[in-house]
């Protein structure tokens, strides 16, 4: 197996390898890579305008004319008055596809806008529904409050009515018992005698022989906040200058007790 040429060269420089094997020659096969469909000879013979070339279309086997600057094509020569210069079918398909794609994107964008608008409308409708439910709830609460107040008022009226009935029944029962006692008494009581008895005075009452007011059963009894001085507090007139006077400490204690009682009341 022959050594590579590079290794042979390094070994030869070091003096290890004395004989260099010749590098094998490669066979070069010439191929025609010229697949340019432009017919330069026909272009020169027809005298086409600048930038115009006659090109062979391998798909249909017919020639057409092509402008290299504008990339426009025509089936007829540019010198022919019936020639129509347009874009190639490939360009037209590409532009149409781009236009359709752009149109689809615009439609999609419009649909998204409509969807967004619909969602906003739905959100607004939900807000209205929520507001309506809130109003309905407030109305129900208000009606419930009114019903509760009405029930409480009706209950109070019934309680007052029952209380009035009870009071009337008690008064009626009391009056019946009074009449029954009068009927069961051994002799009828005269109201005039009762009033005359009330008008009579006790001979021992000071009001029967002096200007003193008529007393009651509690007149003359010691009061709770009254100082115990031993003096006659019922005396009036000339007897007002009586002895002994209460002590200053008793007066202060009585005043303090009276003010305390007034504050509690």
From Swiss-Prot:
The keyword Transcription applies. It comes from the Eukaryota. Residues 245-255 are annotated as: Important for interaction with TXNL4A. Residues 150-163 are annotated as: 7 X 2 AA tandem repeats of [DE]-R. GO terms for molecular function: DNA binding; double-stranded DNA binding; ribonucleoprotein complex binding; transcription coactivator activity. The keyword Transcription regulation applies. Widely expressed with high level in heart, skeletal muscle, pancreas, spleen, thymus, prostate, ovary, small intestine and peripheral blood leukocytes. Sequence repeats lie at residues 104-110, 111-117, 118-124, 125-131, 132-138, 139-140, 141-142, 143-144, 150-151, 152-153, 154-155, 156-157, 158-159, 160-161, 162-163. Residues 46-80 form the WW domain. One of its GO terms (biological process) is positive regulation of defense response to virus by host. Residues 139-144 are annotated as: 3 X 2 AA tandem repeats of [DE]-R. Changing residue 248 to D: Abolishes interaction with TXNL4A. It is found in: Nucleus; Nucleus speckle; Cytoplasmic granule. Residues 104-138 are annotated as: 5 X 7 AA approximate tandem repeats of D-R-[SG]-H-D-K-S. InterPro entries: WW_dom, WW_dom_sf. The modification Phosphoserine is found at residues 94, 247. Changing residue 75 to A: No effect on transcriptional activation. Reduces transcriptional activation. Abolishes transcriptional activation. Changing residue 255 to D: Strongly reduces affinity for TXNL4A. Residues 99-175 have a biased composition (Basic and acidic residues). Intrinsically disordered protein that acts as a scaffold, and which is involved in different processes, such as pre-mRNA splicing, transcription regulation, innate immunity and neuron development. Interacts with splicing-related factors via the intrinsically disordered region and regulates alternative splicing of target pre-mRNA species. May suppress the ability of POU3F2 to transactivate the DRD1 gene in a POU3F2 dependent manner. Can activate transcription directly or via association with the transcription machinery. May be involved in ATXN1 mutant-induced cell death. PANTHER family: POLYGLUTAMINE BINDING PROTEIN 1/MARVEL MEMBRANE-ASSOCIATING DOMAIN CONTAINING 3, POLYGLUTAMINE-BINDING PROTEIN 1. The WW domain may play a role as a transcriptional activator directly or via association with the transcription machinery. The WW domain mediates interaction with WBP11, ATN1, SF3B1 and the C-terminal domain of the RNA polymerase II large subunit. This is Polyglutamine-binding protein 1.
